[in-house]
Amino acid sequence: MSCPYAGNGNDHDDSAVPLTTEVGKIYGEYLMLDKLLDAQCMLSEEDKRPVHDEHLFIITHQAYELWFKQIIFEFDSIRDMLDAEVIDETKTLEIVKRLNRVVLILKLLVDQVPILETMTPLDFMDFRKYLAPASGFQSLQFRLIENKLGVLTEQRVRYNQKYSDVFSDEEARNSIRNSEKDPSLLELVQRWLERTPGLEESGFNFWAKFQESVDRFLEAQVQSAMEEPVEKAKNYRLMDIEKRREVYRSIFDPAVHDALVRRGDRRFSHRALQGAIMITFYRDEPRFSQPHQLLTLLMDIDSLITKWRYNHVIMVQRMIGSQQLGTGGSSGYQYLRSTLSDRYKVFLDLFNLSTFLIPREAIPPLDETIRKKLINKSV
């Protein structure tokens, strides 16, 4: 059956006149389907003991790797656009579009796991012996995605060796080394946030105004707590306010913030965190609308990678349990479970921004000077 969108529905029309004399490639040639569809080599079949589900296992992982390649392609283009002193609104829109594409791809990858789970543990055991020493830990493209996103080497969980040592060929190791040296998406987003208009001390000086608003907000909370007639309830409220004051101190005191960065509990520089908070507060302003979408999509990417890791962990536990080693010699389930921690969450600071919110009515109002600046300035 021919494609209904390609013509009048006939398989062949002898009277049709070609629209061009250029020689093109037919569908299969263009997509190189001869290579793509001939790349499923079932080792169980070569061993004269074919296992039906090995084919599903191969297809699923090859599909993952194809989508990983597209994610890397999108990340590289986004990093190129972000690597500039000024990013105009047109580029910001394109970055948002491509990040959204990555989000949709990751949603597809998350939804792909249940297809693999149609295979039972016994079915998997029938061909698992053929997989060693292969392991998902050896997915070069996934490691490149992590590095290009901004997962730091010191934040990684070690299991037997450095993660890059599992790759034996020099080309793969060079790719890993280059991805570690090149500016990551995290670094480029940080630079971009540091340039957020309105942070200048000689201008709107958002950070000073925000501190004043927080002080007034907490003081109002104290006054309200002091009017509490029940002593125990009053003390509890005052204690809670002091805890909140300490939380705010962690962003207002640069030394405390830097200590949290060194400890791995924060990722952004102090200035970049200020920019992220400002964009969050004023996201309804036209100039900050796209930047806010960009930050939201970065969180979506982090969340979906975590969901994919979690689904992978649960699937591995169902297939091999929690005590066996992985086929590549890793600690299997235990190692995978350890990657679900916040140390693998690249844009952790964006998730924690809600900790520092204040009521809408307490947000410092924008003056006319900064409004005009936002109209005329790209971020």
UniProtKB/Swiss-Prot annotation:
Q: Which residues of this UniProt protein bind heme?
A: H312
Provide the species name: Drosophila melanogaster
Give the family this protein belongs to, as stated in its UniProt record: Belongs to the tryptophan 2,3-dioxygenase family.
Record-linked PANTHER family: TRYPTOPHAN 2,3-DIOXYGENASE (PTHR10138:SF0)
The broad enzyme category this protein falls into is oxidoreductase
Cofactor(s) it depends on: heme
Pfam families in alphabetical order: Trp_dioxygenase (PF03301)
Report the EC code(s) recorded for this entry.
Answer: 1.13.11.11
**Changing R309A: reported impact?**
Strongly reduced enzyme activity
Superkingdom of source: Eukaryota
**Quaternary structure?**
Homotetramer. Dimer of dimers.
**Reactions accelerated catalytically:** L-tryptophan + O2 = N-formyl-L-kynurenine
Q: Name one GO biological process term.
A: L-tryptophan catabolic process to kynurenine
Record keywords: Dioxygenase, Heme, Iron, Metal-binding, Oxidoreductase, Tryptophan catabolism
Cite the InterPro entries for this sequence. Answer: Trp/Indoleamine_2_3_dOase-like, Trp_2_3_dOase
Q: What is this protein called?
A: Tryptophan 2,3-dioxygenase
Q: How is the cofactor bound?
A: Binds 1 heme group per subunit.
Name one molecular function that GO assigns to this entry: metal ion binding
Q: In which pathway does it act?
A: Amino-acid degradation; L-tryptophan degradation via kynurenine pathway; L-kynurenine from L-tryptophan: step 1/2; Pigment biosynthesis; ommochrome biosynthesis
Q: Which residues bind substrate?
A: F57, I58, I59, T60, H61, R128, T327
- Which gene is the coding source of this polypeptide chain? v
